[in-house]
Amino acid sequence: MGTDGAGHVARSTIRPYSETLNVTRDGAPMRTFLHTADGVAIDSVYEPGGVVYDSGKVVYERVGEGARNGSGNALSGVSQGLVFVIAHGFTGDADRPHVRRVARVFARYGAVVTFSFRGHGRSGGRSTVGDREVLDLAAAVAWARELGHTRVVTVGFSMGGSVVLRHAALDAGGVDAVVSVSAPARWFYRGTAPMRRLHWLVTRPSGRLVGRYGLRTRIHHRQWDPVPLSPVEAVPRIAPTPLLVVHGDQDTYFPLDHPRMLADAAGEHGELWVEHGMGHAENAAPEPLLRRIGDWAVARAG
């Protein structure tokens, strides 16, 4: 989708809109809009470790020029350490209950950045279903670095799981560990009923209307041109960055040949966890699994 694929990851400019920037200087969460390399505004939330974000209790402040243009730290005394950048699945957003649940668990292990992909939630633009979303993730990772974090772990679910793989492959050295949950290995898969419905949603005008008004997801009408690097093609390029692939054996979207293809492509630098009884993506990820992922991330990148 779009006239050119996100074939590389440019360093995104961090330009919060000052009138909507939520930042407090006492270690509380903050919320802002980031600008991607192609100019899309991405709604993003930062939570210091151990702090739970509550969208009903935010404080909006203006900040100095350094924070607006990405040339200075928006907070004084931000902890130098591990941060999780969470990439949600298709039709999710930063305020969805399951995304917030994931963030709460990972906040026990480090700081957390959540954001809404383009076309989702409060973010601008239209969804390209995993293509240019790599630029959205790049902006969020750059923001985490700007805030002073020295170790970044990206955790993606479903569409977000494919995005974290491509981002790590295209931006060598940009992250310290990668976790991909419920991701496809290859594009254009239609082997399950949910994926056939998703393709109708994305490719048909009536489907995109359902996406906009029923699922709060604005989907781009253009097809991919060129087709982006597939997840299974991206995985070998991630090494030596540690990679964890997680998949449920009850996933109704992508059967187990997908994670096994990813694990085979990863070789010795990747790990595969097949979770008994788990369905698809963040909605199905139980808290004990999320804690195990947190432990894994700390051991590899912390």
Language-model features and meaning:
Residues 90-103:
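The serine-hydrolase catalytic nucleophile loop
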Residues 278-289:
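Catalytic histidine-centered segment of alpha/beta-hydrolase-like enzymes
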Residues 103-124:
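Conserved alpha/beta-hydrolase
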Residues 252-258:
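Conserved alpha/beta-hydrolase "acid-adjacent" motif
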Residues 4-68, 72-77:
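N-terminal cap/lid segment of alpha/beta-hydrolase-fold proteins
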Residues 238-239, 245-247:
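Short beta-strand/loop motif that positions the catalytic acidic residue
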Residues 173-224:
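Hydrolase active-site cap/lid region
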Residues 128-147:
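Alpha/beta-hydrolase active-site loop
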